[in-house]
């Protein structure tokens, strides 16, 4: 067991991150590690920047000189003696203020340059350290998230797109439910026309055998019924039938009842019942 463990550790070390880089990459990494130090001209400034008390004391000393020179200039102007020129106090005050301004600007610029150099070096150091811990292939989103200081987005498995097959019955039911309101009116009209044709066929008088009792007894009633139907306006009759068949409540019951009454009164129905 111990031998296997040692072999596994050796294999991990053999295939570790340091073995992922080529010879040229290792050389570049070594040079980058050597360049982590600041240039010689900025090393002293960096050492001084590490001790800000020294810079603050120097600036404070220059400020005291400037304040003293300005106060002396004001004093000499108020208490001016005959034959004493104000040029010397003015020159001293101007020199002190100029030195204070120049030293402040230089200190700010040097601190700014040192900050930029240190920032570059720290950035390169962090990126190289991050690259050493990664695999040979680095994802673009990982690099961007590291540089921007954000969490990388979740990785979705890039599975091949699957085609969703919808059964014909399901598709038909979906289409039917979505277009019920569109196809409802023609469907109702077809039912109404079908019921109207059935009613007209029932109302029409069918011929029976000449000389039969049924034919003789129902001849006068049929003739009167035909005359009454001719008097009724066809458009009114169609409108009434359409209204009956398009009605939502009890439509089919009323239609069946009316058709049954008409068929009962028809001569053909009487003939069949008597037979």
From Swiss-Prot:
Upregulating conditions: Induced by specific types of stressors like DNA damage, cellular starvation and proteotoxicity.
Stated consequence of mutating residue 119 to R: Decreased interaction with HUWE1. Loss of oligomerization. Increased proteasomal degradation. Loss of stabilization by HAPSTR2
Annotated positions of the Phosphoserine modification: 167, 212
Assigned keywords, A-Z: Cytoplasm, Nucleus, Phosphoprotein, Stress response, Ubl conjugation
Composition bias, Low complexity: 172-181
Domain of life: Eukaryota
Protein's UniProt keywords contain Acetylation: no
Family of this protein: Belongs to the HAPSTR1 family.
Protein name: HUWE1-associated protein modifying stress responses 1
Gene assigned in the entry: HAPSTR1
